[in-house]
C-alpha cells in the first residue's frame, strides 16, 4: 500500500509538470515527449499495483497431518497413516479375603489372605480387517498364564471370526472381571467351567441380537497331553463345541430386556475326567489345604452337555439378571475308575442378582448380549463423589443326583461325600472414583449340605468377607 501511495504521488507530480510545460513556451518539444513517455510507464505500473492490491491474500498452507495420531483411552492408542492401531492394556486386582467355615462333623477352620487376584499386562491392535488382543499375567499367586490371546478377522458382511484363547460364553462370563458386579462369579461360573479355552469362533451381531458358535479345546496354558489318563496310548486333548444366541426386545440407553440361550458339549478325550466343584464366591480356596473340599464331585465326567438360559432387565439405575444351567454328566466307566465311575446324572446351578446405582449411573448393555464398563457421571477429579453401586445375589447348586456305584465301598468313592447342595447370599457395595478405578466389598453367607457317608457328614456354614482395590487401563 505504501508503494502504491508513492507511485500515485509521483504520477500526480509529473502530471502537474506536464500541465506547466504545456502552458510554457514550446521551447523544448523533445523534453516534453520524453516526459509523456515516462508518465505512460508510470500509469502502467499504477494499474499493475492496483490489481495486486485488489487480489485476496493467499491462505496459509495447512499444517501437515502427523504420521501417527495418539488418542487417550485409559492408555494411549496409536494410529498410523494406514489406520493400523496399537494400545497397551492391563489390570491390577488386589484382594483381602477372610473365610470362616463351621462344619457339623470334621474340622472347622478360619483362614485369611492378602493376595494379588490378578496382575495382568497386554496389548491390542488392528491391521485393516485383522485385529489382535493378548493379555496375561499372574493370578491368585500362581505362575504367569494367558487369558486373551486371539486373532480376529471381520468380513465385509460383519461376521467376526476369532481364533485363539477366549472365553467360553454366557452372560456373566462374557462380562469382564473388570466390570462384573461382584468380586467373583460364584458357583455358577465354577461348575459350568466358564474359563478361557483355545477355540475357533464365529460371531454375528445384529441390531438387537447376536449368534455365536465355536469349536473348543483346552486352555492355552495347559501342557500338551502326552499320554491318556486311563489308556496310555489315547493321548487326546479334550474338545467340544458351543453355541449361544441372544435377543433384546427392548434396548435403549435407559432400558433393556435381554434373553439368551446357550448349549455346550465337551469330551475329555484321553484326559482325566471333568471335576465339578465350587467355592463360596471366592477364588481363594483354602478348602484344598485345610479341612477338605466343601462341594465337589471328584473327577467323574467323561463328557458333558450343558444347556443354559439367560435373562436380564435394566431400567436406568436398576438392573436384574440371572442364569440357570443343567449339566448332563456322562460318567467315566467303573472299569476305568472304580472311585469315580457310575451312572450318568444331572447337575443344576443358577443365580439371580440385582444392582442399583444411587448416584445415577446405569450398566451399559450392547447387542452382543453383554454388559460393559460403567461410565461415571461425576468422577472425583471433576469435583464429584464418583459412583456407588449396591448389589445382592442368590446362588444355588445341586450335585446330589450323583449316585454311588456297586463296584467299591462308599468310603472309596470320595466325591459322594461332597456332592451336595449349595445355597448362598452375597451382598456387595462398589465405589468407582473414576471409570477405571474401583473399590469393592463383598460378604457371603452360604450353606453346604452333603450326604452322610458312614459317620461323616460334611455339611458346612461358610462366611466370606473380602475386599478389592482394582485399577485397569
Predicted ranges, named:
Residues 15-18, 249, 447, 473:
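Structural signature of transmembrane alpha-helix termini at the membrane-water interface
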Residues 26, 273-473:
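Outer-membrane beta-barrel pore domains
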Residues 67-69, 112, 300-301, 444:
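Short, solvent-exposed secondary-structure boundary motifs
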Residues 14-15, 130, 454:
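Hydrophobic alpha-helical membrane context
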Residues 1-22:
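Gram-negative bacterial Sec-dependent N-terminal signal peptides
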Residues 69, 73-269, 346-382, 387-405:
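Outer membrane beta-barrel
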Residues 20-93, 100, 362-376, 408, ...:
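N-terminal periplasmic/intermembrane-space "pro-region" immediately following the signal or transit peptide
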Residues 31-42, 53-54, 120-124, 148-150, ...:
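A general secondary-structure boundary signal
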Amino acid at each position: 500500500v505504501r508503494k502504491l501511495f508513492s507511485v500515485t504521488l509521483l504520477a500526480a507530480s509529473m502530471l502537474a509538470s506536464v500541465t506547466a510545460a504545456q502552458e510554457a513556451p514550446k521551447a523544448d518539444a523533445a523534453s516534453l515527449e520524453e516526459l509523456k513517455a515516462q508518465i505512460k510507464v508510470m500509469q502502467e505500473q499504477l494499474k499493475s499495483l492496483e490489481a495486486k492490491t485488489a487480489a485476496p491474500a493467499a491462505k496459509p498452507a495447512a499444517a501437515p497431518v502427523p504420521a501417527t495420531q495418539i488418542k487417550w483411552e485409559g492408555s494411549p492408542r496409536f494410529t498410523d497413516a494406514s489406520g493400523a492401531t496399537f494400545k497397551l492394556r492391563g489390570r491390577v486386582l488386589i484382594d483381602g479375603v477372610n473365610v470362616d467355615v463351621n462344619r457339623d462333623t470334621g474340622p472347622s477352620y478360619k483362614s485369611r489372605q492378602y493376595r494379588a487376584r490378578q496382575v495382568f499386562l497386554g496389548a491390542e491392535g488392528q491391521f485393516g480387517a485383522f485385529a489382535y488382543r493378548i493379555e496375561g499375567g499372574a493370578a491368585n499367586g500362581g505362575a504367569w498364564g494367558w487369558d486373551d490371546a486371539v486373532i480376529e478377522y471381520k468380513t465385509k458382511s460383519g461376521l467376526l471370526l476369532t481364533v485363539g484363547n477366549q472365553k467360553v460364553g454366557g452372560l456373566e462370563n462374557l462380562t469382564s472381571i473388570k466390570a462384573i458386579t461382584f468380586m467373583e462369579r460364584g458357583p455358577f461360573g465354577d461348575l459350568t467351567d466358564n474359563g478361557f479355552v483355545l477355540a475357533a469362533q464365529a460371531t454375528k451381531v445384529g441390531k438387537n441380537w447376536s449368534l455365536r458358535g465355536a469349536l473348543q479345546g483346552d486352555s492355552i496354558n495347559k501342557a500338551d497331553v502326552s499320554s491318556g489318563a486311563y489308556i496310555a496310548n489315547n493321548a487326546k486333548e479334550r474338545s467340544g463345541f458351543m453355541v449361544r444366541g441372544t435377543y433384546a426386545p427392548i434396548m435403549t440407553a435407559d432400558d433393556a430386556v435381554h434373553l439368551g440361550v446357550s448349549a455346550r458339549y465337551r469330551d475329555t478325550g484321553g484326559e482325566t475326567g471333568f471335576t465339578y466343584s465350587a467355592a463360596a464366591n471366592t477364588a481363594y480356596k483354602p478348602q484344598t489345604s485345610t479341612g477338605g473340599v466343601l462341594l465337589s464331585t471328584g473327577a467323574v465326567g467323561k463328557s458333558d452337555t450343558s444347556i443354559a438360559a439367560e435373562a436380564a432387565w435394566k431400567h436406568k439405575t436398576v438392573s436384574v439378571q440371572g442364569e440357570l444351567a443343567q449339566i448332563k454328566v456322562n460318567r467315566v466307566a467303573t472299569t476305568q475308575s472304580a472311585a469315580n465311575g457310575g451312572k450318568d446324572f444331572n447337575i443344576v446351578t443358577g443365580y439371580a442378582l440385582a444392582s442399583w446405582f444411587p448416584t445415577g449411573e446405569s450398566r451399559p448393555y450392547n447387542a452382543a448380549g453383554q454388559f460393559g464398563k460403567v461410565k461415571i457421571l461425576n468422577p472425583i477429579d471433576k469435583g464429584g463423589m464418583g459412583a456407588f453401586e449396591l448389589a445382592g445375589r442368590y446362588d444355588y447348586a445341586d450335585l446330589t443326583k450323583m449316585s454311588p456305584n456297586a463296584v467299591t465301598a462308599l468310603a472309596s468313592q470320595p466325591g459322594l461325600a461332597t456332592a451336595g447342595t449349595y445355597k448362598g447370599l452375597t451382598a456387595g457395595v462398589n465405589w468407582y472414583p473414576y471409570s477405571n478405578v474401583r473399590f469393592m466389598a463383598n460378604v457371603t453367607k452360604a450353606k453346604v449340605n452333603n450326604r452322610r457317608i458312614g459317620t461323616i457328614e460334611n455339611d458346612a456354614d461358610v462366611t466370606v468377607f473380602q475386599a478389592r482395590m482394582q485399577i485397569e487401563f
